[in-house]
A protein has these predicted regions:
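Donor-nucleotide binding loops and adjacent catalytic segments primarily
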Residues: 41, 46, 50, 169-257, ...
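Glycosyltransferases and closely related glycan-assembly transferases
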Residues: 83-97, 103-119, 132-137
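Short amphipathic alpha-helix
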Residues: 15-26
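C-terminal alpha-helical cap of glycosyltransferases
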Residues: 341-358
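Conserved nucleotide-sugar phosphate-binding/catalytic loop shared by glycosyltransferases and other
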Residues: 4-9, 29-79, 221-223, 308
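Acidic donor-binding loop of glycosyltransferase active sites
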Residues: 93-94, 252-266, 274-275
């Protein structure tokens, strides 16, 4: 049984929040958890706040970078692997959990080179480069979506925070809301999305005043003042926050969500049981957000809207039809809940410990 686990996850909430769910499960079992991440990502705030020691690697991703960065990649990777080996030795972890993203590659190679147990979790429907390269070296490979094509992969879903997994069923949450304005949750991912911010304000402003929903909007820290000003100028009341810390409360409150289609977001929508209009980030690597959104649409839990060509008038028409339709909101929410795999954190934690999950 592993006495300590080193988790490799960084950059954005899509990697960090599922990793935090596993870290919390391991800590509850009495396992020491260390974290290896980047020096610039959200983990710098979220991981210490959760009480886990954070070690930063000096490494940056390669996708979308110039040819000079690619030419220097072997040297940069070798240096990062040596760094990761030192961190792994110093913290004494016997297993490494790679959650994808470029920080996972050196951490995974360090684990393999030192003979430590390597486990991987791929959050997206289309696997990222790091997990594709590391999968043959891993003892266990887990995925958030079925049919990813990774060798040895077991579909367990994406780990979600316990507070979200434990929310009441949609029918219980929605009971008694008939006759009230619909509750619309807007999320542009952990860092916000200006396109979604702009679209939603314009779309809601065009609705008749009596048809407008109550709004809770996560807009990203870079867009907070502009988004608040846009709602005020449009005469639309809204609760606007840079980042929603209590996501379980937001999901419990909502009747419908408009959001990006990152893997962590999709997993949390399913765990909570909440229907959605998903607008995939069009520049995501391998267009993986579109694949994530297609899963939701195909299972009857929402609709995918392509950002290209999407106009506020189209969104207004959709909202005009969706917001008063309590029956459809419940059907979408229940379909989402049926896709939930709420034991993912337990399964992955057991694998990190070298156990089979009962």
């Amino acid at each position: 049984m592993a006495k300590g686990v080193l988790i490799a996850a960084g950059g954005t909430g899509g990697h960090i929040f599922p990793a935090l769910a596993v870290a919390g499960e391991l800590r509850a079992r009495g396992v020491r958890v260390d974290w290896i991440g980047t020096s610039q990502g959200m983990e710098q705030r979220l991981v210490p706040a959760a009480g886990f020691p954070l070690h930063a690697l000096e490494m940056q991703g390669l996708r979308g970078k110039g040819w000079r960065r690619w030419l220097s990649a072997p040297w940069r990777l070798a240096r990062a692997v040596l760094q990761a080996r030192r961190i792994l030795r110093s913290c004494g972890a016997e297993a490494v959990l790679g959650m994808g993203g470029y920080v996972s590659a050196p951490a995974g190679l360090a684990a393999w080179s030192l003979g430590r147990r390597l486990c991987l979790h791929e959050q997206n429907a289309i696997p990222g480069l790091a997990n594709r390269l590391l999968a043959p070296l891993a003892k266990a490979v887990f995925t958030g979506f079925p049919d990813t094509g990774l060798p040895k992969a077991q579909w367990v879903g994406n780990p979600v925070r316990a507070a979200i997994a434990e929310l009441p069923a949609p029918a219980l949450r929605f009971a008694g809301r008939a006759g009230e304005p619909a509750h619309l949750l807007i999320m542009g991912g952990s860092q916000g999305a200006q396109v979604i911010n702009t679209l939603v304000v314009a779309a809601v402003a065009a609705l008749p005043a009596a048809a407008r929903p109550e709004i809770w909007h996560q807009c990203g820290s870079a867009h907070l003042e502009n988004t608040q000003a846009a709602y005020a100028a449009a005469g639309v009341a809204a609760r606007v926050e840079a980042f929603i810390d209590d996501m379980a409360a937001a999901l419990a409150w909502a009747d419908l969500a408009i959001c990006r289609a990152g893997a962590a977001t999709v997993a949390e929508l399913c765990a909570a049981g909440l229907g959605s209009l998903l607008i995939p980030f069009p520049f995501a690597v391998d267009d993986h957000q579109a694949a994530n959104a297609r899963f939701i649409e195909d299972t009857g839990a929402g609709r995918m809207l392509r950002q290209e060509g999407l106009e506020a008038t189209q969104l207004t028409a959709m909202l005009h039809a969706l917001l008063p339709d309590r029956g459809l909101q419940l059907r979408w929410a229940e379909a989402a809940r049926r896709q939930a795999r709420t034991d993912a954190a337990q399964v992955v934690a057991s694998a990190c410990q070298g156990e089979a999950h009962a």
